[in-house]
Amino acid sequence: MSCGNVSKQSNDPQLGCPRCGVNGSMVVLFIPHRQRREFRAVNRDFASSLIQLNNTFYREHSASFSDTRQAPWPGWVRTMDIALEQLDVATIEHPVRVFDLACGNMRFENFAAGGALAAKGVDGANPSADASCPFEFYGVDSCQDLAIDARGHALRIPNLHFQELDVLDALMKLNPAETPDVLFDAPLADISVCFGFMHHVPSCEYRVRVLDALVRQTRPGGIIAISFWEFMNDERMARKAVRAEARAELTPPFEGYDSAQFEAGDHLIGWQNDRHAYRYCHHFDDQQITDLVRGVRTFYKSGEVPVRELERFHADGRSGELNRYVILKRL
């Protein structure tokens, strides 16, 4: 497992990661991102502070954030087309179970339920009008105020189950050797998704653990869809990150803040006109994503990757390339 930090000169996927120390040897770093940084391993305390920084942001800005996050993402259309094409829905004796890790304000659930019912000739803008929704939703998020927001998406979505859980806090409490089979209060899903969250997960170790938790929550034959934010390829977002990080050097966002602790791809982004609001975000490249998927195998005794990649594509934003989607099938 190399976590995206191994040398491009090597084609050996078994080379060790200098950050995680998995499978051995040190290699020359190659950071494809245009803003390269010297590699530094993120320590546990610093990672915890970054997580708390984001938790504080969403608690304090849940309303304004949700107001700007109402429209569905174009990438969701293709995601659901692929997922439903792969699943033999006719053989599923229960509503299709959809698990959403970091569900936010439930707009994906609103999109999925509304689109499915619209296809049946029912008003997609009011999905609760039909009790025969073909989906059963299980959403998990650390911020209930965001999930159950004032616009009432959650109240309009049929067959919705919500669990308030800070998955990163739960994973950080585990011994590194532990791999819990049960982390969520939900049955195994036919479709598991994680949109707009991976960029908030600090360090290679915890990104692999989050993906592993998503894989374990999916039944064999089920579909897993994840989005990875490539925000530093967008000039406007890159400028926002530069400004926020310069501000953080003058007014640190938390005690012990040290930008030298960042990994390549780690950034801070501000929010609207609040000079004290920060979000920790990680910019991904394709090699990191590939290594992340491969990294899940370290949790399985056979050493085999428990998923097969079906498709990878760009979507969203003005450029149509703001997010990188990866669609996996659970083996």
Predicted regions, residues:
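Class I (Rossmann-like) S-adenosyl-L-methionine-dependent methyltransferase catalytic domain
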Residues: 20, 29-99, 104-176, 181, ...
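Local beta-strand N-terminus motif with an aromatic residue
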Residues: 95, 188-189
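Cys/His-rich microdomains that often coordinate metals
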Residues: 7, 24
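A short, conserved alpha-helix within the catalytic core of class I
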Residues: 201-213
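Conserved helix-to-beta-strand junction in the class I
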Residues: 213-220
